[in-house]
Amino acid sequence: MYIDTASDIIEQTVSGFNTTIFAYGQTSSGKTHTMYGTASETGVIGMAVEQLFHAVEETPDRRFLMNVSYMEIYNEMVNDLLCDSKSRPAGGLKVRENEEGFYVEDLIQKTVTSAEEIHRYLLCTIRLYS
């Protein structure tokens, strides 16, 4: 499934495009399992992160700035998953539009330089939402 869906998105990212990997479905339909995977089977996020950093290493003639955000839309509310649940706004975050396109106001973005950093952020969210 990863090769058919997310692999091309990572190639576009390395080419300079802003990209998003988005999981959609009913509650308990397997979105979290598909995205995170298990201890023995890497999920979409893990494979994408590894592919991204491998591609960066293979492109030494370019400089990359990588930011990571992680959010969910649940019951029509946008929640920042990199934010402690206690400090989230009660009504969720707002989706806005400007001349550059759509964005989520106040969504945390973390600058990252390694796959390990992203995995640490994800581990924090797994602990908060498990």
Each model region followed by its residue ranges:
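Microtubule-binding structural modules
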Residues: 1-130
